[in-house]
Amino acid sequence: MTAAFQLSINGQFESCAATFESINPATGEVWEHMPEAQTDEVNRAVQAASQALKAPEWAGLTASQRGKLLYKLADLIEKAAPQLAQIETSDTGKIIRETSSQIAYVAEYYRYYAGIADKLEGSFLPIDKADMQAWIVR
């Protein structure tokens, strides 16, 4: 049996041996067993995310292309809004009307950042620290 919720590591969903009970505060009942990532899984996820940011599939995108991806994400969130609101209601005990409006805001936040993705400008300043960057933002 596959769990409803899984870890996402390096673009793949995977089951997790450790889980915890998520209790709906409104009912006091367990509504789901959630994956509980262990140290190895967290380390693999962090490493995969770090590599993904440096990979040409992401690093090679223009700001405009990244903005288009954020628009697409907003559309996907909007399309899945009823399911996402129900999940959030079960997890937090909030009323569905509240979580529905919050999910709508999430989609709008992504649209906002998608719209400014190619409008932010600044200058990169070289510095003597390999793990840091300095920018002038206007």
Q: What do the PLM-derived regions correspond to, one by one?
A:
Residues W31-E121:
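Glycine-rich loop-to-alpha-helix module at the N-terminal edge of alpha/beta enzyme cores
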